[in-house]
Amino acid sequence: MRLAIIGSTGLVGRQIIEVLIERKFNFSELILVASKKSVGNTLIVADKSYKICSIDSLLEKKPDLALFSAGSNISLKWAPILAKLGCKVIDNSSCWRMDDRYKLIIPEVNGSELTKKDMIISNPNCSTIQLLVVLFPLHKKYNIERAVVSTYQSPSGSGEKAINQLFNEEQGVVGEMVYPHPIYRNALPHIDVFQENGYTKEEMKIVNETHKILDKKINVTATAVRVPIDGGHCESVNLTFSSDFEIDNILGELSNSPGIVVKDNVEKNVYPMPIYSKGSDDVFVGRIRRDFSLAKSLNLWIVSDNLRKGAATNTVQIAEYLLENNILK
């Protein structure tokens, strides 16, 4: 199987390569694609050197599967071209997510929707992925009526330049500003551009993607905040169900669901934190407690590595699902 990675030198692209090797993903040929400034350079993958190619070369190399993490403009142009050539595409950009022609997939949640006809498959937003991995088993059991989500997101979600801004400010170095304000020792309630309704685009991604993947009947509202941590996204989530619940049953549902690790022992100071989620493919959940202010309501704290499960790992898991279920061709 000929595998192409488009955007192979970026934060997510490098992470995809790492996850592929860790999970022993089976390919016969690896084609690494990056921007013109990187073409001709080499990357070492599993002790083997690979020369970085231009995206145009894919027309000749004809990959069977292409993993895109090079931004919306590249995906908009090249994903349909490759799909017409018979190549399956898994795309990390936002350009196809709300397009009804394409499926938005989290394998633990809706992987079973995939068929051989799906040539372009969209990877959800990082904050949506970790949220819905946790909400899915609870919605099946208790039917979520409303979700209030507040996120606390690492600058790594904005790319390498944003991480550099954080590190430069921490060291007192003047450098390029990705954000309109300093991020070090600050919290920015502003992720992506503001919309006419007063929400940011990031906040609306959480709302719209939850409706597309899980259930359009769930009332969702979100506030997304950028915080000065070098990796990991956190979410404070308040849920209201149509059915009542017992906390022990909630713990049981979450503990027995794939991709979830429950860390919930406040007496021993055990709860999810981004510093401990780094490098993990799991979604961590804790601070699980009944909301005493509203009937049938629950509070949760969800943490995950946004570059792993929030991007690279979910992409690779979709690819694994295609292979395991003979959907690739």
Residue ranges and their predicted role:
Residues 1-183, 219, 283-284, 288-294, ...:
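N-terminal Rossmann-like NAD(P) cofactor-binding subdomain of oxidoreductases
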Residues 66, 155-329:
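Charged docking surfaces used in two-component/phosphorelay signaling
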